[in-house]
Amino acid sequence: MRTHPSCKAFFTHLICFVSALVLLPQAAAGAQPPPVDVGLITKLSGEATYWNETSQKTPKPAQVFMKIRKGDHLKMGSGAALEIVYFQGGRKEAWQGPAVIIAEETGSRAESESTSKGQVTVAMLPSEASQGLRRIPALLEQARLGRSGGIQVRGPEEGVKKTVVPGKKGQTEIARAREAYQRWRAQTSPEDVTPELNLLGTLAEYQQYAEMEKVVQNALERQPDNEALKELEQWVQGKLGKAKQ
């Protein structure tokens, strides 16, 4: 008995449909979104690496001003020092190595109890701190992408960016960021540039390049060897037409 061609086509499509239903959940499971960003490394000295069982299984060197994701493992060598600010709740942690910690939504936990004794100092930052700090990794990435070989690069359409006048919402947010900076700066050690970073993140959101230049230079006075801040300064100066050729 021969099967009619239309029946063969029907069964072929049916098999493909069933196979797709079986494979679709597996494909979705294999395409999980990356873990959420939960914090920012604001200070780092010595050797430290990070990895994540979900998205970054191979350890890589940690960097200052690098964002931290939920589930990140951070391993600090002997003598290493690392500070993290968590966006939710404004928790600031200062860790001393050797230690291995795991980042959670509002803070870190030591991988083992033996590394948690006398290894961390905790402070709580102003509630306004998280908004500006969240923008810092993207801002620094812009600065790096806008430079090549240490020379400011501009596309033909960019030209000089003048500081713009923000709308009412922007003016309110900038005013709050300035007030938070003044309070925060008075309570922070001189070499800590976290208050400057928070203000820079807000100013960048509204293209306040002239004020950004002053804030970056202030931060560089506190950390003159910080290469990320040097890159950011040249990027801002490029926006103002002051790039060194």
Label each residue range with its predicted role:
Residues N198-L203, E233:
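Structural register within alpha-helical repeat arrays
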Residues T12-P25:
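Bacterial N-terminal signal peptides
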